[in-house]
Amino acid sequence: MKGIKTMVKKMMKIAGTLFIVLLVVGIGILVYLCYQNLHWWEKDMKQIEKLGVVERQVTLPNGNVINYGELGGDAPALLLIHGQMASWEDYSSVMPELNENWHIYAIDVYGHGESTHEDEVYYLDINGDDIIWFIENVIQQETVVSGHSNGALTAA
């Protein structure tokens, strides 16, 4: 009987130690993931800085402001329009490849980033008209337009 109690005590000690080790490792992983989640944009910003993307703003005649990132030299124009809950910076992961063949303009649609935040402009027709103005007055050349999610609806 004494041998069983000793064995049970040893097993409990091992189980307790294992539990504490797993708890510490789990907390460490949780802290790491929380940090990554709170600093997710830093990777995008480093990529944007490395590429030399220039952030600009243009004020339209109607007073609306379009914020955008521009990258590239003498190449055909490509306009990137993001979807909901995003910004032009979200294209940073594909910009290196796109920059090989395109002069990139990635805009913040209204209500996002540094573009106008007014309820009256959150309509596809207004966005569409203002993007046409942007192409005609800022890009000033034939432009391929690509949109993601809601940005694709705007592009259409």
Question: Which positions does each model-derived feature cover?
Answer:
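Gly/Ala-rich beta-loop-alpha elbow adjacent to hydrolase catalytic centers
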Residues: 147-151, 155
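Active-site loop/oxyanion-hole signature of alpha/beta-hydrolase fold enzymes
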Residues: 109-146
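Conserved HGGG/HGGXW glycine-rich cap/lid loop of the alpha/beta-hydrolase fold
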Residues: 71-114
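Alpha/beta-hydrolase fold catalytic core
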Residues: 3-76
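Short beta->alpha connector loops
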Residues: 64, 85-87, 152
